[in-house]
């Protein structure tokens, strides 16, 4: 199996003579050893093998890792199949009749065989005879015992899809790591339509992986479909063979067994179903890939199909906003919607993609806000400086300027009055001045009215009369006093008293007259003031 032919025993068996490998050489090895069955690490069974070689169908009895096999085969050009032990299994094939292979084009050869196979290192794999080129039927009966890793009994179909019926009765013992016996009753397809079906297994020491396959149509060489269903037995580490479940997958149930048996009869129908199923299965990964690509494109901001895109607006001048046009990577419909939804004619839409674009937009806004805050801080500092300067310097200067303005106004008024007087000297009066002068003349005439003068004269006359009366009274008093003095000489004191009283009376009269004189002078002053006012009004007009 690994590059040499001959009968070799592994793990303690002594091999008989071995020869080198050749394409046409017959190798005959005869070993006689105690027979061993079942689970063995080198046990061998007596084999007597005769291998005849043909052109392309030479049969060789080859034992690997200590197993001996005996096969008696003969065959045609393409129809022989060597019986090979797998990895240390020893097998003995006893044929009731001569076991012959098929012919060139698959003539039917009845090969009733009964084989008893002992377990090898990795389990026995007794191989039945295969069909011919265009399909032969073969019947095999085998009984196998479990190997180290379990036994496996199987059969293959013919080249173009012949029917092979296998009535297999297996008595299998579990291997060290879990035997994998298979009870198979199936009609297998041909070269382009074969489909392995159905096994029932028992658990091993470390947990055997069990598979029960029930399939409907036979698969081809390039598109076999296998649907493993798990039925695990208890072990130390069971391995479960499962099928990935998708939205389009359909679970295989046990109810499909009858449909399977019915469909196995019609080979062309199986082939068409297999082709359709292959096409469907080949479309599934493509659909998954398309969905994954769609999901990736919808989240990738570098593609135009991404869903993470939106429009933001920048403020510009209205004249500049008219000049902006649609960028090449933006869709026309989205651009039209963004232009319709813009808040004012002074804004333009800008498209951003993904979270990175949004982050950049946020960073730009934060930078602009920071710059605006810096500018506002500068403005605030300048305003505080101006306010301090105004309070300390400008306000005091304003007060000084106001006081200077008051002084200047006074000086201007003085100059104005002086200029007015200078202008009025030797100059003709104006219309306003003539009016004022006429008003003053009227007032002056009123003051010089004879009625007014008569009143003043009357007052003066009354004053004169009063003065005369006062003189008369005083003279009368003096005369009376003289009379009293004559009458009462002796009364000096009395005379003195009367003199004092007369003096007091005179003084009172003088005071009264002086008061009246004061009143007259006051009236004269009032008249003079009124005359001056009238003159001023006349000068102004």
From Swiss-Prot:
It is a peripheral membrane protein. Residues 1-13, 83-102 have a biased composition (Low complexity). FG repeats lie at residues 2-3, 11-12, 56-57, 65-66. Its main location: nucleus. Residues 398-425 form a coiled coil. The keyword Repeat applies. FXFG repeats lie at residues 21-24, 39-42. One of its GO terms (biological process) is protein import into nucleus. Present with 9310 molecules/cell in log phase SD medium. Component of the nuclear pore complex (NPC). NPC constitutes the exclusive means of nucleocytoplasmic transport. NPCs allow the passive diffusion of ions and small molecules and the active, nuclear transport receptor-mediated bidirectional transport of macromolecules such as proteins, RNAs, ribonucleoparticles (RNPs), and ribosomal subunits across the nuclear envelope. Due to its 8-fold rotational symmetry, all subunits are present with 8 copies or multiples thereof. NUP57 is part of the NUP57 subcomplex (NIC96, NSP1, NUP49, NUP57) interacting with NUP49 and NSP1. Contains FG repeats. FG repeats are interaction sites for karyopherins (importins, exportins) and form probably an affinity gradient, guiding the transport proteins unidirectionally with their cargo through the NPC. FG repeat regions are highly flexible and lack ordered secondary structure. The overall conservation of FG repeats regarding exact sequence, spacing, and repeat unit length is limited. PANTHER family: NUCLEOPORIN P54. This is Nucleoporin NUP57. It comes from Saccharomyces cerevisiae (strain ATCC 204508 / S288c) (Baker's yeast).
